[in-house]
């Protein structure tokens, strides 16, 4: 398939620049993957769509305030976007400035250039940066970093984003982009789901800035996915097996949870074993023709045209169903992308 097969026209006014006043106030488009039926609704309809005995899998990564501003020794301004925290004092980052720093160059980061750092090495398009402070990197980021809003939100981050560009169940810091399907859940709806007999499990995938990179090839088979770190614990594996055994569904909240679970499944297939814990980097690329091993239903936001995420949704729901759903979403004025509305999709099995 061609990347252009996943194109759709999106009016600029449908891109959500701010979240709804309440997390659950978004709309929800329900897509039945087998019949192709579409139903417009509200996000709170999730309570009717999940069933007793289902397992809902969330990504518990925490978004770090990964964007920093500062200057080089020459005085030139620069912007640093952390891609990954390497240890307590070092990060791998994207650097934007007029002239790329070289190994050994000093950087001063923060509004008042309060933190000194050194450019240690360059790794392809990323820079390894080490802070000289005794403070830990995560503490420095909490002090001087900005929330790394996606480029299409196209506004400076605000104080409210520290809460709203973060799930209520976040636990493990490391992401530089939110697992956005999870932004719709508040504590009230989670408690109501539990009261209904729905079980929860948590994987971790630290979403990287690569999730916003455009696909730069024509044929999707030529695309190489960026690498992200994922964790699927023994507890999650046991919960999945128990759910399948009782006839329940595994419902993934977000494409990052899908990629975590299916990475574990693909690793097990290659090893010739049953589903097992997975703690590793993954470059899994899911596109039409992929056979899902774990996930039965998916909660996800509306994604960018020609992105790997709309390809994943097309693999899950069927290409024609997906493009029809996106056409309806545009016509019915759904809000798109990170702060936008959501879909609930059951897998196409026939």
From Swiss-Prot:
Functional note: Transfers and isomerizes the ribose moiety from AdoMet to the 7-aminomethyl group of 7-deazaguanine (preQ1-tRNA) to give epoxyqueuosine (oQ-tRNA).
Key words, A-Z: Cytoplasm, Queuosine biosynthesis, S-adenosyl-L-methionine, Transferase
InterPro entries: QueA (IPR003699), QueA_dom1 (IPR042118), QueA_dom2 (IPR042119), QueA_sf (IPR036100)
Gene Ontology biological process terms, A to Z: queuosine biosynthetic process; tRNA wobble guanine modification
Oligomeric form and interacting partners: Monomer.
Taxonomic classification: Bacteria, Pseudomonadati, Pseudomonadota, Gammaproteobacteria, Vibrionales
Listed EC numbers: 2.4.99.17
UniProt protein name: S-adenosylmethionine:tRNA ribosyltransferase-isomerase
HAMAP family tied to this protein: QueA (MF_00113)
Cited PANTHER family: S-ADENOSYLMETHIONINE:TRNA RIBOSYLTRANSFERASE-ISOMERASE
EC class (word): transferase
GO terms under cellular component: cytoplasm
Highest taxon, organism lineage: Bacteria
Species, as recorded: Aliivibrio salmonicida (strain LFI1238) (Vibrio salmonicida (strain LFI1238))
Pfam family, one: Queuosine_synth
Gene3D superfamilies according to UniProt: QueA-like
Family affiliation: Belongs to the QueA family.
Catalytic activity: 7-aminomethyl-7-carbaguanosine(34) in tRNA + S-adenosyl-L-methionine = epoxyqueuosine(34) in tRNA + adenine + L-methionine + 2 H(+)
GO molecular function, one term: S-adenosylmethionine:tRNA ribosyltransferase-isomerase activity
């Amino acid at each position: 398939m061609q990347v252009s097969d996943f194109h759709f026209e999106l009016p600029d006014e449908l891109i959500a620049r701010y979240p709804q006043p309440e997390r659950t106030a978004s709309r929800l488009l329900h897509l039945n993957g087998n019949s192709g039926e579409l139903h417009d609704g509200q996000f709170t309809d999730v309570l009717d769509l999940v069933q007793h005995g289902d397992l809902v899998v969330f990504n518990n990564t925490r978004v770090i305030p990964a964007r920093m501003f500062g200057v080089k020794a020459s005085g030139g301004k620069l912007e640093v976007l952390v891609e990954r925290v390497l240890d307590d004092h070092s990060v791998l980052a994207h650097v934007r400035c007029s002239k790329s720093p070289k190994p050994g160059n000093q950087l001063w980061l923060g509004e008042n250039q309060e933190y000194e750092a050194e450019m240690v090495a360059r790794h392809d398009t990323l820079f390894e940066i080490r802070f000289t402070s005794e403070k830990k990197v995560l503490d420095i980021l909490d002090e001087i970093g900005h929330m790394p809003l996606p480029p299409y939100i196209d506004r400076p981050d605000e104080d409210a984003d520290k809460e709203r560009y973060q799930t209520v169940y976040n636990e493990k810091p490391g992401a530089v982009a939110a697992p956005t399907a999870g932004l719709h859940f508040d504590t009230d709806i989670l408690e109501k789901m539990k009261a209904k007999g729905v079980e929860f499990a948590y994987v971790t995938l630290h979403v990287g800035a690569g999730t916003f990179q455009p696909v730069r090839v024509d044929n999707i088979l030529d695309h190489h996915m960026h690498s992200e770190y994922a964790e699927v614990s023994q507890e999650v594996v046991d919960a999945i097996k128990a759910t399948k055994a009782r006839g329940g569904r595994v419902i993934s909240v977000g494409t990052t949870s899908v990629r975590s679970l299916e990475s574990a499944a693909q690793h097990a297939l290659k090893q010739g074993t049953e589903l097992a814990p997975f703690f590793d980097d993954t470059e899994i690329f899911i596109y039409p023709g992929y056979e899902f091993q774990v996930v039965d239903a998916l909660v996800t936001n509306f994604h960018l045209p020609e992105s790997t995420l709309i390809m994943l949704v097309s693999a899950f729901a069927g290409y024609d169903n997906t493009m029809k759903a996106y056409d309806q979403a545009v016509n019915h004025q759904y809000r798109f992308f990170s702060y936008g509305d959501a879909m609930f999709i059951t897998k196409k099995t026939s």
